[in-house]
Amino acid sequence: TSHGGGKAGKSKLLDVNY
C-alpha cells in the first residue's frame, strides 16, 4: 500500500502495484 494504496479496495498484493 505504498503507491496508490487501496485502489477501489483491491487485493493487498495488488495494492502495492496499484
Curated annotation (Swiss-Prot):
Post-translational modification: Glycosylated.
Tissue: Shell nacre.
Organism superkingdom: Eukaryota
GO MF terms held by the record: calcium ion binding
GO biological process, one term: shell calcification
The keyword Oxidoreductase is assigned to this record: no
Keywords, alphabetical: Calcium, Glycoprotein
Disulfide bonds: none
Annotated function: Calcium-binding.
Miscellaneous remark of the record: On the 2D-gel the determined pI of this protein is: 4, its MW is: 95 kDa.
Name this polypeptide is given: Calcium-binding shell glycoprotein P95
Organism annotation: Unio pictorum (Painter's mussel)
Biological classification of the source: Eukaryota, Metazoa, Spiralia, Lophotrochozoa, Mollusca
